Amino acid sequence: MTVQRLVAAAVLVALVSLILNNVAAFTSNWVCQTLEDGRRRSVGLWRSCWLVDRTRGGPSPGARAGQVDAHDCEALGWGSEAAGFQESRGTVKLQFDMMRACNLVATAALTAGQLTFLLGLVGLPLLSPDAPCWEEAMAAAFQLASFVLVIGLVTFYRIGPYTNLSWSCYLNIGACLLATLAAAMLIWNILHKREDCMAPRVIVISRSLTARFRRGLDNDYVESPC
């Protein structure tokens, strides 16, 4: 059985979502923070970097001699206090921890959906394109990714006065929308197939059967493809 174009398109959309999700995770441009002394820095899920103060025409005040202040970065992890510097540390720490967890779960779900598609192409009995659970498994994986990304992004609905959302956050919003689109395409395809199969079988009886005293005639019938 050849893979339908709609299924292949949904998997391709989910692959783009997976790429955008990883790009957003490993860049340091999730939010931009401004400190009281005028310095600015960009904070990501796993690292933060100081930014050059171009308005002053020189290096940032916190730069030390012999170091490039444009990318003076530090790694972040679970429960990092640095992400909440200048803001309510408890709130910001919870926001980033929640987003890290949701990002990892979404990456795992999108990857599982891609592997399910590839294993179906190989021809495994349980995950073959002929199996009814093949598309359902991919749709469930993509929908899970969309759901957890929404949960993580909602935590950034309220941010402090010194913090602004940056382009990595909007990139992750795009990944969430693409994952939702991929799941919706598969769900629509599944429901469309079921509607076709729920139609009653069409049986056309030959007119010759109505003739009297004639035997041995076979039924001429046409059944639905399901």
UniProtKB/Swiss-Prot annotation:
GO cellular component terms, semicolon-separated: adherens junction; plasma membrane
Cytoplasmic side, ranges: 1-5, 125-136, 192-226
TM ranges: 6-26, 104-124, 137-157, 171-191
InterPro entries, alphabetized: TMEM204
Gene Ontology biological process terms, A to Z: lymph vessel development; regulation of vascular endothelial growth factor receptor signaling pathway; smooth muscle cell differentiation
Bilayer disposition of the protein: Multi-pass membrane protein
Residues exposed to the Extracellular side: 27-103, 158-170
UniProt keyword annotation of Transmembrane helix present: yes
Induction data: By hypoxia.
Tissues expressing this chain: Highly expressed in lung, heart, kidney and placenta. Lower expression in thymus, spleen, liver, testis and ovary. Expressed in endothelial and restricted epithelial cell populations.
Alphabetically ordered keywords of this record: Cell junction, Cell membrane, Glycoprotein, Membrane, Stress response, Transmembrane, Transmembrane helix
Glycosylation sites: N164
Subcellular location: Cell junction, Adherens junction; Cell membrane
Protein role: Can influence paracellular permeability. Appears to be involved in cell-cell interactions through adherens.
Name this polypeptide is given: Transmembrane protein 204
